[in-house]
């Protein structure tokens, strides 16, 4: 930021229902959907804004010189644009949505890794709250993401136990001084 107190925004977008299209119709359909959504998003951004694909079905948009209230308007207009978009593939028509995390970038932010993580957490919260919505980053979003990730692991471990996919190994602990097994 060149001006003191200048605010920018990062939008972290994650397409809803992309996996269904990709799995149902194949990677060709998924790739075409990504191309069309990219063109759609790009058509609504200002020349000074930056759109980038972050991976999979995730995009980042840097809104330069854009305070949070304006960024929220842009995010909602992008969300509505994607929501109203119809993707045609062969004889099928799909509707998709987009979950968007919004993070305000100021001069005193903690660096790129923090900004990306915060925007990702906000996006995760938007998805967790019901998808196809915009969520402005809150400090407790990181905790929600960690807790949900922990719950996901707990569920996976419990399923592995139920499926008898785990086996236990042990190694006795022996004192070096007298070679006796510790209890």
Region spans (language model):
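Catalytic core regions of nucleotide second-messenger enzymes
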Residues: 53, 69-73, 82-98, 127, ...
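Short, intrinsically disordered, charge-balanced linker/junction segments flanking boundaries
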Residues: 2-5, 29, 171-174, 178-183
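Short beta-strand edge/capping elements of PAS-family sensory modules
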Residues: 7, 113-114, 132, 182-183
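Catalytic-core segments of nucleotide cyclases and related cyclic-nucleotide turnover enzymes
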Residues: 27, 72, 90, 105-131, ...
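C-di-GMP signaling machinery
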Residues: 125-170
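Catalytic strand-loop-helix junctions within cyclic-nucleotide turnover domains
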Residues: 62-71, 90-93, 98-115, 140-145, ...
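Amphipathic alpha-helical regulatory segments at dimerization interfaces
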Residues: 40, 44, 77, 81-85, ...
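Conserved long alpha-helical elements within nucleotide-processing catalytic cores of c-di-GMP signaling
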Residues: 2-9, 16-46, 52-64, 68-76, ...
